[in-house]
Amino acid sequence: MALGARRVAGVDEVGRGPLAGPVTAAAVVLDPANIPEGLNDSKQLSVKRRNLLGDALASSADISVGHASVEEIEQHNILRASHMAMLRALAGLRLRPDFVLIDGAMVPQGLNLRAQPVVKGDTRCLSISAASIIAKIARDKIMVDLAQQHPGYGWETNMGYGSKSHISALRNLGVTPHHRRTFKPVHHMLYQDKNVKP
C-alpha cells in the first residue's frame, strides 16, 4: 500500500450521521518512533482514554483538523462535505505526506496525493485510528460549545445525533441554524410548519 512512503497520513471523519453540527475530519502523520499505545477507533474508547490519547498525539504527531459546515452539507451532500473536510485536514498538515490512508471505500475527488481507501480503517490502521480520535475530540468540543448557545437539545451528550431527547427537543423548541435541513427528521419538522429558532 504505502511501500516506500516516509510520511504516511491517516485520515478519518466524524459526524456524517448527526442531525446537527459540522462534519469534521482529521489527518495524522504518526512519528514511527513515538506511537502512543492503545490507538483504536475513537468509538471504542472511553472519553477519558480518548482525551489522553489526543494529548499524546498532539505532542508526538503531525495533526490537522478540517470541517465542512452545515451550509456545505446542505449545498453539496454529506459525502461530498466529508471529503471537503478531509481535503482541508490534509492541507493543514505541517509537511505534505507521501501517501494517504483514508477510512472508507473512496478517495476524495481532488486529492493530488497517492492514496488508498481502507474499509474499516479506523480499526485496521494506526494512523487512521489516530485521525478518528483527533476528529472526534475536535467535533465533540464544537458540539459542547453549541450546546451552551442552544440549551435543551442535549448536544453536549448526543453530539447532534438523533437521540430520542434530541428529536423531542426538535418538536418542542424548533429547528436551529445548526440543524441539517435536508436530513429526514429535521426536514419533516420543517414540513410540519415548526418555527425555526433564530
From Swiss-Prot:
Annotated a divalent metal cation binding sites: 12-13, 103
Name the CDD domains on file: RNase_HII_bacteria_HII_like
Q: Which family is it part of?
A: Belongs to the RNase HII family.
Give the UniProt entry's GO cellular component terms. cytoplasm; ribonuclease H2 complex
From the UniProt record, list the reaction(s) this protein catalyses: Endonucleolytic cleavage to 5'-phosphomonoester
The organism that produces this protein has a lineage beginning with:
Bacteria, Pseudomonadati, Pseudomonadota, Alphaproteobacteria, Rhodobacterales
Q: Where in the cell is it found?
A: Cytoplasm
In Swiss-Prot or TrEMBL terms, this protein is called: Ribonuclease HII
As cofactor, the record names: Mn(2+); Mg(2+)
EC numbers, comma separated: 3.1.26.4
Q: Does the keyword Cytoplasm apply?
A: yes
Residue ranges of every copy of the RNase H type-2 domain listed in the record: 6-195
Enzyme type, top EC level: hydrolase
